[in-house]
């Protein structure tokens, strides 16, 4: 998916996906990030910033350390307020436009069922696979229970399928 976006779509769409899968933010929160936020981080020599999540209204630290140089290089190319600018005036792209671009890239990469939550779920899935820390992931995603978090990222079904695939009496 990253390859399809990087090679065949705009840098804006690639960066939206890259930041989405590395932060687990909802698309509505991603679209509100301003270019100056990234530029200020470089000046302050830090690679994380606070955001107030739209759905939960909770503040969260967003860490971009692993992708900061790439995000900063992209931000420097923009002459717009928004990190993911629309071509229609000084505003970010809409959630619908983000969805359309992800759908097109998914079709190109032969990936079915791509949506705007795909980035958040991908982050959650790989965070859990790498750390096995469901409590921390639950906190990051602001879920009320570990069970909701595991169901959201598809782990329960995957683990159940793996067990049943090898189950024999």
Regions found by a protein language model. Give the residues of each.
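Short, polar N-cap/turn motifs at the start of nucleic acid-interacting alpha helices
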Residues: 38-42, 133-153, 158
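Conserved tyrosine-mediated DNA breakage-rejoining catalytic core shared by Y-recombinases
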Residues: 32-64
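Short, basic (Lys/Arg/His-rich) helix/loop patches that form interaction surfaces
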Residues: 5-8, 99-139
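Basic, Lys/Arg- and aromatic-enriched nucleic-acid-binding interface segment
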Residues: 1-23
């Amino acid at each position: 998916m990253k390859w399809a976006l990087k090679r065949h779509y705009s840098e804006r769409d690639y960066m939206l996906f890259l930041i989405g899968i590395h932060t687990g933010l909802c698309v509505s929160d991603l679209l509100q990030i301003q270019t100056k936020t990234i530029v200020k981080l470089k000046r302050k020599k830090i690679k994380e910033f606070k955001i107030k999540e739209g759905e939960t209204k909770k503040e969260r630290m967003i860490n971009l350390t692993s992708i900061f140089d790439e995000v900063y290089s992209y931000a420097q190319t923009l002459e717009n307020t928004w990190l993911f600018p629309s071509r229609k005036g000084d505003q970010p792209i809409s959630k619908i436009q983000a969805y359309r671009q992800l759908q097109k890239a998914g079709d190109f990469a032969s990936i079915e069922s791509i949506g705007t939550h795909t980035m958040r779920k991908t982050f959650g899935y790989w965070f859990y696979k790498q750390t096995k820390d469901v409590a921390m992931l639950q906190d990051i995603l602001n879920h009320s229970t570990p069970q909701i978090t595991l169901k959201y990222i598809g782990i329960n079904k995957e683990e159940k399928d793996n067990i049943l695939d090898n189950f024999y009496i």
